[in-house]
């Protein structure tokens, strides 16, 4: 009979790509993961890892076995969720991947709330970009993602995942203090034709929003600089290098050289918690969603 922990180690290597990353996700040492894989190779009489450059990669047989392991681990997760539901107390480890501004502006309060209410719940946070986190949940790399989409660019979930809305994060046009629009009560997208934009790189949710919104207004956005983090975008705006749309969550105080102007219509970023359907009955999932919504209620709209 195949050992579940060894299958878990193989699945982790398949998800994370390297033995070192798999070990970090499992809380093991790399040598311990390698030993588990070696034992699984002896159990199956099959080569599972092969040398590739300076590292290793899964063989074709290993990839197929990892797919089966994923299904088995899903059944185990469902069984564990049912047992936790019967006990009624959130417990065990729950790994959460949150996008940067949520990790900064939302999650510290959530972690503190859950730690005080449920000491048996071991919540682990990772800061992960939203274009990656949902896939990590689907692959079993994390238990939950705190992610977002925009009203004009809705998110489609892969099969087997569930979500719950946390709240709606409003965004503002951010411009240098001396900008021609700095004193306006509000501005429409049509008035932004020709403006130099600073935004996140192509492929990111925020970049997709900008392109869709400006094209709908009849022009192509002229993106001159890109950066991953909103504080960097604000710094570029402060230097007079462009304008940006910055959500309010986790934004923090702005430099004196930067002002915000409301947009009409207001850009809305929608926040979600996403998890695998097998874990839906876990009290830990329900309680984390509760804490997220409660914390959102206290920070929503903060500048």
Predicted regions and their residues:
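Beta-alpha-beta core module
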Residues: 155-165, 169, 231-278
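Secondary-structure junction motif
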Residues: 148, 181-182, 188-189, 195-217, ...
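Acidic, Gly/Pro-rich loop/turn segments at junctions of secondary structure
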Residues: 117, 128-194, 249-254
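A late-sequence structural motif
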Residues: 106, 258-303
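A short LG(V/I)-centered, amphipathic sequence patch enriched
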Residues: 41-58
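Short helix-boundary/capping micro-motifs
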Residues: 12-27
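Hydrophobic hinge/microswitch elements
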Residues: 129-142, 148, 199, 203-259
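Central regulatory/effector-binding core of bacterial HTH transcription factors
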Residues: 91-154, 227
């Amino acid at each position: 009979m195949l050992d579940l922990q060894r299958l878990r180690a193989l699945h982790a290597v398949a998800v994370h790509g390297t033995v070192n990353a798999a070990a970090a996700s499992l809380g093991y040492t790399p040598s311990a993961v390698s030993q588990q894989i070696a034992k699984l190779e002896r159990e199956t009489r099959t080569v599972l890892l092969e040398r590739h450059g300076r590292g290793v990669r899964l063989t074709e047989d290993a990839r197929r076995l990892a797919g089966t392991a994923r299904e088995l681990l899903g059944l185990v997760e469902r069984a564990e969720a049912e047992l936790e539901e019967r006990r009624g107390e959130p417990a065990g480890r729950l790994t959460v991947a949150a996008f940067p501004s949520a990790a900064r502006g939302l999650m510290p309060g959530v972690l503190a709330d859950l730690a005080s209410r449920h000491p048996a719940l071991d919540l682990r946070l990772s800061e992960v970009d939203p274009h990656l986190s949902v896939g990590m949940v689907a692959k079993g790399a994390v238990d939950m993602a705190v992610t977002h989409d925009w009203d004009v660019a809705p998110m489609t979930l892969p099969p087997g995942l569930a979500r719950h809305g946390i709240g709606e994060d409003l965004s503002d046009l951010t411009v240098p203090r001396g900008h021609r629009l700095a004193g306006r009560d509000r501005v429409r997208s049509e008035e932004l034709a020709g403006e130099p934009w600073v935004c996140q790189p192509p492929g990111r949710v925020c970049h997709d929003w900008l392109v869709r919104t400006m094209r709908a207004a009849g022009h192509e956005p002229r993106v001159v600089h890109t950066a991953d983090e909103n504080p960097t975008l604000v710094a570029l705006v402060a230097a007079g290098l462009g304008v940006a749309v910055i959500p309010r969550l986790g934004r923090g105080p702005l430099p004196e050289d930067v002002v915000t102007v409301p947009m009409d219509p207001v850009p809305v970023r929608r926040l979600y918690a996403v998890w695998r359907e097998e874990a839906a009955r876990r009290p830990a999932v329900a309680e984390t969603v509760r804490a997220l919504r409660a914390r959102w209620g206290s920070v929503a709209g903060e500048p």
